[in-house]
Amino acid sequence: MKEKIALFGAGGKMGVRLAKNLLKSDYRVSHVEVSEVGKKRLKDELGLECVSTEAALDNVDVVILAVPDTIIGKIAAQIAPQLRPGTMVMTLDAAAPFAGHLPDRPDLTYFVAHPCHPLIFNDETDPEARRDYFGGGAAKQSITSALMQGPEEAFDLGEAVAKVIYAPILRSYRLTVDQMALLEPGLSETICATLLQVMREAMDETVRRGVPKEAARDFLLGHMNILGAVIFNEIPGAFSDACNKAIEFGKPRLMRDDWIKVFDREEIAESIRRIT
């Protein structure tokens, strides 16, 4: 008999995504949701009923916490006394585990699984897959996983569950929790999201200065495509001399000399503290 999974936050946006994919598996799933809105969403969209926490945790093998980072510690502390040794607690983000918000239970297995989301450069041909920017639906995406604590053989179970909830899968990478924290919030949010926000503000500024919005958007997104393909080695090539000169003078104008320190452990820890 396949393992029993308790999905907490099953009626949230992420929870419903996971519940939908779990329906395609052989896992035995119990759904837990406290809000009436979430219960209704789960019922309306997937025809699923929620159960009590006690029923969900009875002989459970894997507990998935599809809840906000800010309450993971609280929920984990509440359910920990009801979990038998060897139970896996899975979080969908490294923030709370990195911050030490999980209970001090050496006899539990802690597993973290986070999606990479569909790549900008991909080979999807189906229109639905090409429009699946988030992943877990039609487009393939890679995933990252970490076994924070627990027996080595537990990794296979955690990865197997992760491959189901985030399917379809392109590649699967095993990392440490610290490495996952470098990727998020470090690389994906502090760096990527911030610089994308700056690019959007820059585009808006060209519009304010008279460039038609559609022209500015096409120009920026098109250049992001080719420049990204070159700099991430998707295609052979090099930037023009003029472009390299613009980077040489533009980078110090835009970036502090010590920007790379956002990856220092203290900075990552402080960033996580702010969101948990």
Swiss-Prot record:
GO BP term, example: tyrosine biosynthetic process
Listed cofactors: Zn(2+)
EC number: 1.1.1.421
Keywords: Carbohydrate metabolism, Metal-binding, NAD, Nucleotide-binding, Oxidoreductase, Plasmid, Zinc
InterPro entries: NAD(P)-bd_dom_sf, P5C_Rdtase_cat_N, PGDH_C, Preph/Arog_dehydrog, Semialdehyde_DH-like_C
Positions contributing to Zn(2+) binding: 114, 184
Recorded GO MF terms: metal ion binding; NAD+ binding; prephenate dehydrogenase (NAD+) activity
Pfam families, sorted: F420_oxidored (PF03807), PGDH_C (PF16896)
Record-listed NAD(+) binding positions: 12-14, 33, 69
Annotated metabolic or biological route of this protein: Carbohydrate metabolism
Reaction catalysed by this enzyme: D-apionate + NAD(+) = 3-oxoisoapionate + NADH + H(+)
Family to which this protein belongs: Belongs to the ApnO family.
Main function: Involved in catabolism of D-apiose. Catalyzes the conversion of D-apionate to 3-oxo-isoapionate.
Protein known as: D-apionate oxidoisomerase
